[in-house]
């Protein structure tokens, strides 16, 4: 299997604060990998380094063979990105926004691509609504659609299900799992243990900028112990170290 993401001793300091501290991990093709940790653990900073939005203080990364610190535009042309709680332009309709993204990426068959995603994510009836009038869940569907519009092989999603109702959560989770089954690769960040347990093949547990565990999701739980108990023990043990 091809290595889609490789992080090597990635570190990011903001003044005297270390947001990410020497983290190394890899994500393989056809994998749904989760960065799992509480708020403030370094998940978003890690994604921003991998997508070239933030330069690391130390260490390096390769994303689909490119260095995001040296070629951020090249990386972002290849991958899909769903930032946390990103809001599309309020003055555009949902359809206009997808057309705008498609034109920026010089895509063909724009109408066909947009129709597919409105149907696939189940918000065809909202295509003519202004983005400012969309519910939070529909806006999230729209941001997922724009990330997949150019049919990328790798997508990075920061907190994909935050503040979404259960029906929208189910739609997004089902779609991500189907995308991976079809050969795509996804890296998500989440602070919700149940999401990682349900849909992720492997997880990296982050706390205070450090990687405490990286491996199979079921391997996080010890014999006779729940995943939640093991996760909390990891985080509390690190906090007390």
PLM regions and their residue ranges:
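Conserved ABC ATPase signature
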Residues: 130-137
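ABC ATPase "signature
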Residues: 214-215
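Conserved catalytic motifs of ABC-family nucleotide-binding domains
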Residues: 151
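Catalytic Walker B motif of ABC-type/P-loop ATPase nucleotide-binding domains
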Residues: 155-159
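Helix-to-loop junction immediately C-terminal to a conserved catalytic motif
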Residues: 51
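Conserved ABC ATPase "signature" region
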Residues: 99, 103-126
């Amino acid at each position: 299997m091809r290595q889609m993401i490789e992080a090597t001793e990635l570190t990011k300091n903001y003044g005297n604060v270390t947001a990410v501290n020497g983290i190394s991990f890899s994500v393989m093709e056809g994998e749904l990998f989760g960065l799992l940790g509480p708020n403030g653990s370094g998940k978003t900073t890690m994604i921003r380094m991998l997508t070239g939005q933030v330069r690391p203080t130390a260490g390096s990364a390769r994303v689909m063979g490119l260095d995001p610190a040296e070629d951020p535009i090249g990386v972002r042309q290849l991958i899909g990105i769903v930032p946390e709680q990103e809001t599309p332009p309020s003055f555009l309709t949902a359809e206009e926004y997808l057309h705008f993204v498609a034109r920026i990426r010089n895509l063909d068959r724009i109408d066909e691509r947009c129709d597919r995603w409105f149907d696939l994510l189940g918000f065809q009836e909202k295509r003519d609504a202004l983005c400012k009038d969309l519910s939070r869940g529909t806006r999230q569907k729209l941001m997922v659609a724009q990330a997949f519009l150019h049919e990328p092989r790798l997508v990075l999603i920061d907190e994909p299900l935050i503040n979404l109702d259960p029906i929208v959560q189910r739609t997004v989770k089902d779609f991500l799992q189907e995308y991976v089954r079809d050969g795509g690769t996804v890296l998500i960040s989440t602070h919700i243990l149940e999401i990682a347990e349900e849909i992720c093949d492997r997880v990296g547990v982050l706390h205070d900028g450090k990687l405490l565990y990286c491996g199979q999701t079921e391997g996080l739980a010890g014999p006779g112990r729940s995943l939640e108990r093991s996760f909390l023990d990891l985080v509390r043990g690190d906090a007390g170290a």
